[in-house]
């Protein structure tokens, strides 16, 4: 799971890849915002709208904690009395199939109160409109594993820059393939 304290605090006027990630998360959360990498007035007002806080649009750890699920592509839901897979999927704007696929040990007609479910959001997890960093790759891999629990992931070590060298393992059998990008 991703550690929030690694996140960059963002201020109005900043530019760059983390501003793109902020804008991507806001867009995925349903806000109408362009992804241009510039923390201008539009981004500021959208952050205020998303957080419900006016008078300051600094993006701190508290704000990132709200946004990270939209970068990973899923959230979690603690089952309460009266919940059903249908009601949970509807609450988060996703499908029953996606919730069941992410939680293979859950019986749709027998939800236990207190069970923590993974709830994938209904959008493509791999973005094609932002620059990539090791941060984004880790979020994508985490999100893929949450959506597809049969997908195994791990780290082969670290790059010279200190980033994890991640791998994905899918399926079983005698044939193996390795792809490095």
What does each model-identified segment do?
Residues 71-82, 86-181:
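M14 metallocarboxypeptidase catalytic domain recognition
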Residues 64-70:
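Short, basic amphipathic alpha-helical segments that act as recognition/interaction helices
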Residues 17, 42-47, 83-87:
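Short, solvent-exposed linear patches
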Residues 1-37, 77-80:
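Acidic, Ser/Thr/Pro/Gly-enriched interdomain connector segments
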Residues 27-30, 50-56:
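Short capping motifs at secondary-structure boundaries
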Residues 47-50, 99:
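Conserved hydrophobic/aromatic packing and binding residues within compact polymer-binding modules
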Residues 43-46, 63, 94-95, 159:
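Ser/Thr-centric signal marking residues that sit
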């Amino acid at each position: 799971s991703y550690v929030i304290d690694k996140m960059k605090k963002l201020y109005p006027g900043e530019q760059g890849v983390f501003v793109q990630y902020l804008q991507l998360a806001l867009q995925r959360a349903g806000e109408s915002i362009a992804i241009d990498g510039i923390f201008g007035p539009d981004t500021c007002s959208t952050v205020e709208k998303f957080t419900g806080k006016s008078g300051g649009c600094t993006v701190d750890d508290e704000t990132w904690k709200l946004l990270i699920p939209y970068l990973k592509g899923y959230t979690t839901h603690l089952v309460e009395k009266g919940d059903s897979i249908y009601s949970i999927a509807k609450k988060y704007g996703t499908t029953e199939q996606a919730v069941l696929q992410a939680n293979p040990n859950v019986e749709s007609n027998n939800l236990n109160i207190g069970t923590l479910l993974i709830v994938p959001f209904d959008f493509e997890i791999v973005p094609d409109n932002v620059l990539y960093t090791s941060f984004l790759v880790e979020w994508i891999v985490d999100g893929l594993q949450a959506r597809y629990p049969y997908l195994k992931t791990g780290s082969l070590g670290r790059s010279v820059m200190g980033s994890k060298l991640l791998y994905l393992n899918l399926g079983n059998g005698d044939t193996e393939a390795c792809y490095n990008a």
